[in-house]
Amino acid sequence: MQNTIRIIGIDPGLRRTGWGVIETLGNSLRFVASGTVTSDGELDLASRLCQLHDGLAEVVHGYQPHEAAVEQTFVNKDATATLKLGQARGIAMLVPARAGLRVAEYAPNAVKKAVIGVGHGEKQQIHMMLKVLMPKAEFKGNDAADALAIAICHAHNRQAVTSRLAALAG
């Protein structure tokens, strides 16, 4: 017998960290909620990271996901920006891990491939496919949409692993 699994996807960012919560049962997906956690750009880095931590902790506590997925960081030419993104990503991984959740990581192209079928695509394609996969999905902005896509990527990957394990158990 299968159980419903609640997954939170997190799209880390220092200004805005997107989050999206879905439920999966077998191959079906159901939208639960999405949003963003923001930090005040006028504050020092440590205070901004605390804001992200507290906001994400509130989301995880409120929606009680079973598993979490976080997008991997890409390295760009601005080393300082990359380091700050890495620190925000650390918060995005720490919060669900401290709540006892297993945290999976996915490359941006793996997320796009899971949602739109190819590893390179436009934000508009992701938005459109989110509505196809979960017609009741509501998201404001790219960060929340990306977080939902990350959660869907994890749902597809965990389903593939479950199917392989079932086949091996035969």
UniProtKB/Swiss-Prot annotation:
This is Crossover junction endodeoxyribonuclease RuvC. The RuvA-RuvB-RuvC complex processes Holliday junction (HJ) DNA during genetic recombination and DNA repair. Endonuclease that resolves HJ intermediates. Cleaves cruciform DNA by making single-stranded nicks across the HJ at symmetrical positions within the homologous arms, yielding a 5'-phosphate and a 3'-hydroxyl group; requires a central core of homology in the junction. The consensus cleavage sequence is 5'-(A/T)TT(C/G)-3'. Cleavage occurs on the 3'-side of the TT dinucleotide at the point of strand exchange. Its main location: cytoplasm. GO terms for biological process: DNA recombination; DNA repair; SOS response. InterPro entries: RNaseH-like_sf (IPR012337), RNaseH_sf (IPR036397), X-over_junc_endoDNase_Mg_BS (IPR020563), X-over_junc_endoDNase_RuvC (IPR002176). It catalyses: Endonucleolytic cleavage at a junction such as a reciprocal single-stranded crossover between two homologous DNA duplexes (Holliday junction). PROSITE patterns: RUVC. One of its GO terms (cellular component) is cytoplasm. Its EC number is 3.1.21.10. Its cofactor is Mg(2+).
